[in-house]
Curated annotation (Swiss-Prot):
Domain Ig-like V-type: 20-138
Disulfide bonds: 161-219, 265-309, 353-396, 442-484, 529-571, 616-659
MF annotations from Gene Ontology: carbohydrate binding; CD4 receptor binding; protein phosphatase binding; sialic acid binding
Species, as recorded: Pan troglodytes (Chimpanzee)
Cytoplasmic-side segments: 709-847
Protein name as annotated: B-cell receptor CD22
Family of this protein: Belongs to the immunoglobulin superfamily. SIGLEC (sialic acid binding Ig-like lectin) family.
Motif, ITIM motif 1: chain positions: 760-765
Domain note: Contains 4 copies of a cytoplasmic motif that is referred to as the immunoreceptor tyrosine-based inhibitor motif (ITIM). This motif is involved in modulation of cellular responses. The phosphorylated ITIM motif can bind the SH2 domain of several SH2-containing phosphatases.
Extracellular side: 20-687
UniProt entry tagged with the keyword Signal: yes
Residues the record lists as Phosphotyrosine modifications: 762, 807, 822, 842
Length: 847
């Protein structure tokens, strides 16, 4: 029983471990590599039956503590359901999630990080420790170059440079060098950061030559700035055919018959070593010649030719450049070749003396019918104009520095002549019009041998109803010429005859004479109606624009072109045969933007809160490329498209707008267009409520003010009756009342008129003296007698501003003139007043 207890405990622990592991599945690289100061990217995925991950801890070199039943070790990172606790170094990042991604990043990584990384995962029902090996070196470890099993010259191969490192936070590059020099071929670099592998790979494709054999290829690891980190080198083993060169004795490879020649085949390079040797002459293998040296004893002229050596190895045969061996000998019996035989009378004939010799013959002797031809010592005899007496047998003898040859059989010269006095005759009556049927015949005087055929030129799909007769159906236009030839062994051509076909004008086109560049509005423009040819030459011209007749001259001139002159132009040219029209030519006039206007959608009155679109419409060629918008203060708006969209539109947007359009020719601007934004019912309701309340408050205050004013006036009136009255003066100023402007454009301008000035109206009222008391005043007449020195008058004046604006043609913006009224009131007492003339004085003072 005591022995059974530990075994049962072990079985239970194994079962628990197995059941726990069955709930977790991880995928990641087994080992990751890096170096001091770099970073490590750990791609990782996991799968857990219980997806509710509660905590994640990253240990460095974890060890299981049996006493605490937990893992001990340096905690690089810890994440719980309550939140993340960053590491002290803040260099470890958990890039995964609580579902299936457990990717990690350590940046920077240090040498002491080498060892095991433990990923401790805990859920509600299970726990797991996943281990990952990390190898961090003190210095960047070198990449590894992978070569194909075999490299042959001129065959494309792929060199692979592999580095077991890749990290998003630490960029690197792999550089290829050949003998320390960067290779010109472009390499393809790829990286892998997957759960299967982490690496950086560079692949280089190039075609090595035999000269690359034994050269050093380097793959250099560099950082992002190109700084050297590490490298790997390999020596190329390029398999190639033997490379050969022939050395000849004598060096110029020129010998006389009976002398000896030695040729040596030198192998400059071969990989692998060569196995067989052979010699070739003029491409044919020489028997029993399988050494690097070829000896030719007592050579003959037949041994002259091109020699090369061929050496083979396991890759294939290598062949040297050819060496031409010249064996010199005296001329052999000569033969004569007659060029251009049989010869035509009047033509040139050339005789060639052919004799095999090395070196070539330097002197020749010619014979005609067995008689030596004096002065003929060249290889060729040229007779510029052959005559019948030149016929006969020709032979020759050749001579070089080694001796004189023998005269061989001669060559016979046969002198013949082509048909004589050949002519082409037109059978039709003249003149010939385009489309007519024309018949021609070919005649000649004599021929040796007899004429067997006729030729015509130019060639065409024409009929030959009989030998020497040509019929042309539907003859074409132009000054066509026809010539015929009567042929036996050779052809004699007649002089060409012109058909002189009459036709309507051809190739009519419109050509712009000026300006040579683009046509701008206002330019002087000339159009020329051109045609290539016409027969007869007397022609007339007609110009049309869009189907409308313009003129009858060859040139159409515009002193100052306008956009309205643009259109499709064509011209007509006619003669007595017919007329021809040109293709339509489009006259395009470039002009700056014009007729600009601002259109408003849905209209120039918009309720606030809605959208308003202002469109800058224009007429321009080329089309407007840039738009600028301005408000009523001529301030440019930050909008440069054709449409200005206000959404939502506000009351503050009310005002005048204008736009400016620009193209490559110039610019133009529109007049002002006013946009009115009125309040929405909601805003009006709010403002009416506020206004009504304000008016009610003002009304109450006004009523109170009127009552106080009346009480004050009553008090002042009583005081005035008690006091000795005297003249009172006061001014009353009428305030301006603004009125809406008339329907004048916002852009209207006026001119100031200094003569239209303000005025002062002045009036004095004088009253006659009277002692007649008014009804009810008898009892108080004495008391109210005025002082003798008082002048009973009322003075009234008005400072009057005329109803006009500051400018003559601008209507003022107010409905009434602003005036200052001045009055002086004299209180009259009761009693006698001195006699005075009743009058009214009125004065206007202008200032």
């Amino acid at each position: 029983m005591h022995l059974l207890g530990p075994w049962l405990l072990l079985l239970v622990l194994e079962y628990l471990a197995f059941s726990d592991s069955s709930k977790w599945a991880f995928e990641h690289p087994e080992t990751l590599y890096a170096w001091e100061g770099a970073c490590v990217w750990i791609p990782c995925t996991y799968r857990a039956l219980d997806r509710d991950l509660e905590s994640f801890i990253l240990f460095h070199n974890p060890e299981y503590n049996k006493n605490t039943s937990k893992f001990d070790g340096t905690r690089l990172y810890e994440s719980t359901k309550d939140g993340k606790v960053p590491s002290e170094q803040k260099r470890v990042q958990f890039l995964g999630d609580k579902n299936k991604n457990c990717t990690l990043s350590i940046h920077p990584v240090h040498v002491n990080d080498s060892g095991q990384l433990g990923l401790r995962m805990e859920s509600k029902t299970a726990k797991w420790m996943e281990r990952i090996h990390l190898n961090v070196s003190e210095r960047p470890f070198p990449p590894h170059i992978q070569l194909p099993p075999e490299i042959q010259e001129s065959q494309e191969v792929t060199l692979t440079c592999l580095l077991n490192f890749s990290c998003y936070g630490y960029p690197i590059q792999l550089q290829w060098l050949l003998e320390g020099v960067p290779m010109r071929q472009a390499a393809v670099t790829s990286t892998s950061l997957t759960i299967k592998s982490v690496f950086t790979r560079s692949e280089l494709k190039f075609s090595p030559q035999w000269s690359h054999h034994g050269k050093i290829v380097t793959c250099q690891l560099q950082d992002a700035d190109g700084k050297f980190l590490s490298n790997d080198t390999v020596q190329l083993n390029v398999k190639h055919t033997p490379k050969l060169e022939i050395k000849v004795t004598p060096s110029d490879a020129i010998v006389r018959e009976g002398e000896s020649v030695t040729m040596t085949c030198e192998v400059s390079s071969s990989n692998p070593e060569y196995t067989t040797i052979s010699w070739l002459k003029d491409g044919t293998s020489l028997k029993k010649q399988n050494t690097l040296m070829l000896n030719l004893h007592e050579v003959t002229k037949d041994q002259s030719g091109k020699y090369c050596c061929q050496v083979s190895n396991d890759v294939g045969p290598g062949r040297s450049a050819e060496v031409f061996l010249q064996v010199q000998y005296a001329p052999e019996p000569s033969t004569v070749q007659i060029l251009h035989s049989p010869a035509v009378e009047g033509s040139q004939v050339e005789f060639l003396c052919m004799s095999l010799a090395n070196p070539l013959p330097t002197n020749y002797t010619w014979y005609h019918n067995g008689k030596e031809m004096q002065g003929r010592t060249e290889e060729k005899v040229h007779i510029p104009k052959i005559l019948p007496w030149h016929a006969g047998t020709y032979s020759c003898v050749a001579e070089n520095i080694l001796g004189t040859g023998q005269r061989g059989p001669g060559a016979e010269l046969d002198v013949q002549y082509p048909p004589k006095k050949v002519t082409t005759v037109i059978q039709n009556p003249t003149p010939i019009r385009e489309g007519d049927t024309v018949t021609l015949s070919c005649n000649y005087n004599s021929s040796n041998p007899s004429v067997t055929r006729y030729e015509w030129k130019p060639h065409g799909a024409w009929e030959e109803p009989s030998l020497g007769v040509l019929k042309i159906q539907n003859v074409g236009w132009g000054n066509t010429t026809i010539a015929c030839a009567a042929c036996n062994s050779w052809c004699s051509w007649a002089s060409p005859v012109a058909l002189n076909v009459q036709y309507a004008p051809r190739d009519v086109r419109v050509r712009k004479i000026k300006p040579l560049s683009e046509i701008h509005s206002g330019n002087s423009v000339s159009l020329q109606c051109d045609f290539s040819s016409s027969h007869p030459k007397e022609v007339q011209f007609f110009w049309e624009k869009n189907g409308r007749l313009l003129g009858k001259e060859s040139r159409l001139n515009f002193d100052s072109i306008s956009p309205e002159d643009a259109g499709s132009y064509s011209c007509w040219v006619n003669n007595s045969i017919g007329q021809t029209a040109s293709k339509a030519w489009t006259l395009e006039v470039l002009y700056a933007p014009r007729r600009l206007r601002v259109s408003m959608s849905p209209g120039d009155q918009v309720m606030e809160g809605k959208s308003a679109t202002l469109t800058c419409e224009s007429d321009a060629n080329p089309p407007v490329s840039h738009y600028t918008w301005f408000d009523w203060n001529n301030q440019s708006l930050p909008y440069h498209s054709q449409k200005l969209r206000l959404e939502p539109v506000k009351v503050q947007h009310s005002g005048a707008y204008w736009c400016q359009g620009t193209n490559s020719v110039g610019k133009g601007h529109s007049p002002l267009s006013t946009l009115t934004v009125y309040y929405s019912p909601e805003t009006i309701g709010r403002r009416v409520a506020v206004g009504f309340g304000s008016c009610l408050a003002i009304l109450i205050l006004a009523i109170c003010g009127l009552k106080l004013q009346r009480r004050w006036k009553r008090t002042q009136s009583q005081q005035g009756l008690q006091e000795n009255s005297s003249g009172q003066s006061f001014f009353v100023r009428n305030k301006k009342v603004r009125r809406a402007p008339l329907s004048e454009g916002p852009h209207s301008l006026g001119y100031y008129n200094p003569m239209m000035e303000d005025g002062i109206s002045y009036t004095t009222l004088r009253f006659p003296e009277t002692n007649i008391p008014r009804t009810g005043d008898a009892e108080t007449s004495e008391m109210q007698s005025p002082p003798p020195d008082c002048d009973d008058t009322v003075t009234y004046s008005v400072l009057h501003k005329r109803q006009m604006g500051d400018y003559e043609n601008v209507i003022p913006d107010f409905s009434e003139d602003e005036g200052i009224h001045y009055s002086e009131l004299i209180q009259f007492g009761v009693g006698e007043r001195p006699q005075a003339q009743e009058n009214v004085d009125y004065v206007i003072l202008k200032h």
